[in-house]
Amino acid sequence: MLLTVFCCICGWSINAQETTRTAQGLKNIIQEQGLSQEVIFYSPDIVRVIAYPGQTRPEKKSYPVVLSPEEVKLDYTDNGDILSMKTSCMEVRVNKQTGKIAYYDLNGNLLLQEKEFGINFIPRQDGPNKSYRVSQRFLLDTDEIIYGLGQQQDGRMNQRGQELYLFNENTKVSIPYFTSEKGYGLYWDNPSPTTFSDTPMETSFNSETGLMSDYYFIYRNGTQDGVIGCIRKLTGASPMLPLWTMGFWQCRERYKSSDELCDVLDRYRELGIPLDGIVQDWQYWGCDSNWNAMKFMNPRYINAMGDEKWMRYLPNGEDPNANYPEPRIKSPKEMVDYVHKHNAHLMISIWPSFGPWTDQYKELKEINALLPVITWPRNSGAQPYDPFNPKAREIYWKYLRNLYDMDIDAWWTDATEPDHFDRKDKDFDFMTPDGTFRSVHNAYPLMSNKGIYEQQRALSDSKRLFLMTRSSYFGQQRFASFCWSGDVVSQWHVMRKQIAAGLNYTLCGIPYWNT
């Protein structure tokens, strides 16, 4: 009676166990849970496993994954309750009754197994949509060491024995992926806020919203090089960065005029200290209401001090009556050319949020592509844009062309989590074209960097791209994205923690990182 009631709630009935072989794996009905389960081989070393209530697979977009399933030679062995599928790299055994899956190497050594009946769906409302809280539980060896989960600030290398809330924010990059000393990797493909938990009883991912459980198991020859090679195949290759980006950089918070920036460059050259890159930080656009205008509108940069048309843009806190000397560098383009003439490169700060005076703000508001959240700078009226909206990404690039056309060399994509203060649950009900902000949250930096990379690449392939960003997600390496560890404080114990943070981050398959 209980089973009948549950199946009616799910909208379908189960009369008998059904396991069907497919071209890429199998489809299985788990009677006791009323779930459909699919095992899909993308390659001999990458297998995807999904499960969902009912018989019809929900539509789902994967932001990191770019690989389509390849034709894979599978050797099936049916031993009653257990169906085995073997490739040239691994063996996957499925319990047809319970749906439990176990992964083995070709010598029969157990790599990882799911927990029996370890998939849970709890109905919830996600904004206007019906959805579920989705969790999946696994069993690891007692003393097994795992790495990954992005860039955490706890100083730990081994990620066992803890609970982590995977939610992107300043200094914390959350990637629902771990890799084992046994030579496999596991990516949980859900960009909503997710809790990772590891106890002596189980290891689990529990996501705030989703229509299916969805993960990728990766195993190639038992090495981390093999796993990372598979990640690049699954999510995209990492482009070669410009050689100069591997050199010495100079940055401060912040240069307040073109002269100040160029004077610092001059001093490096006088001292004979090699310098490859120098950074123009925030407020070159002016005051907070004009935040991220992507134009030099600060009167100190455009030789317009005293001009009423431009003085309204003078940054908050700067004295409009101060006796500033006549600038030697009189325009932003002259500054960029000066940097290049002295054999250096210029990176400039750009943000996902826009102040209410900017043209971007007005255009994005017209298409409902501004997130209704409190962001940096506070009390300015600035709002982050919606990078899941293709039109919004086009608007973003249209204005970034102002800086691109000046021959600026690299982009500092700051605060790409994005900053979100005084968070309320209703903030996450905002509807993007792909669903609620809650359902896509952690993929925000991936999509924001994607928009810049792809729009610039469509314009020209003559110059290597370089994007330094404050946040990241699985697969972001394909957008020439270089993450740094955010606004950490300058203390020795904090610096020590960055070593583990960077190593765990790069073990997620993203090679470039700094602090």
Features from the language model and the residues they span:
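Catalytic domains of carbohydrate-active enzymes, especially glycoside hydrolases
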Residues: 263-283
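Bacterial Sec-dependent N-terminal signal peptides
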Residues: 1-19
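Extended Gly/Ser/Thr-rich low-complexity repeat segments
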Residues: 38-45, 58-68, 93-107, 116
